[in-house]
Swiss-Prot record:
Residues noted as binding Ni(2+) in the record, renumbered to the chain: 101, 103, 107, 145
One Gene Ontology MF term: acireductone dioxygenase [iron(II)-requiring] activity
Protein name per Swiss-Prot or TrEMBL: Acireductone dioxygenase
Co-factor: note: Binds 1 Fe(2+) cation per monomer.
Entry similarity comment: Belongs to the acireductone dioxygenase (ARD) family.
Length: 190
């Protein structure tokens, strides 16, 4: 199940809220313009291509494109591999998103498989949204956040963009992300 955990931004040891209730998650996040919803899962091949993922969710993807005006959509597929380069690739992919940053674009992600955590630093709180298969999270442009896919990333996520440049982050040079439980720690605590 999806999990929302909230802490003061100065004290990762004090959990103010921890919930798996979808309605409570929706209500808390919508205060900040963040939307959370769920889609019915579809069958996918073991190692799907971006095209196979998008085709499986064509109706939902088209509806989001129509509603939000996105012009580019793709699917990120991360899965453990026997390739000797996999550990280095996984580490590099994870580290790319682990620091606080913002985007000039909304960040909409649907998890078709696996999980990841979006940490939203809003006001004086950190909201860790552990998204799992079936979750669609929409984070408004310019929201300070970071993302952790874990030390062994294993997910399929559909990504939506308003321009052809795709993902462009403006990093904030803070150490806030280092002070909060990681994806692996949140998963282990369940």
């Amino acid at each position: 199940m999806s999990l929302l955990t909230v802490w003061p931004d100065t004290d990762a040891g004090t959990v103010e809220l921890r919930t798996e209730d979808p309605q409570e998650i929706t209500d808390v996040l919508k205060q900040f313009g963040v939307s959370f919803s769920r889609w019915e899962l579809r069958e996918l091949p073991e190692r799907p291509s971006s095209e196979e993922v998008l085709e499986a969710y064509r109706a939902e993807v088209d509806e989001v494109i129509e509603r939000e005006g996105y012009i580019k959509v793709d699917a990120a597929v991360m899965a453990p591999s026997q390739d000797p380069q996999w550990p280095a690739q996984a580490k590099a992919a994870r580290e790319k998103f682990l620091s606080e940053h913002t985007h000039d674009d909304d960040e909409d992600r649907f998890f078709a498989r696996g999980a990841g955590v979006f940490y939203l630093h809003i006001g004086d709180r950190v909201y860790a949204m552990l998204c799992e298969a079936g979750d669609l999270l929409s984070v408004p442009a310019n929201t300070t956040h970071w993302f952790d896919m874990g030390t062994e990333p294993d997910f399929v996520a559909i990504r939506f963009f308003h321009d052809d440049d795709g993902w462009v982050g403006a990093f904030l040079n803070t150490d806030t992300a280092e002070k909060f439980p990681t994806f692996d720690e949140l998963m282990a605590s369940r």
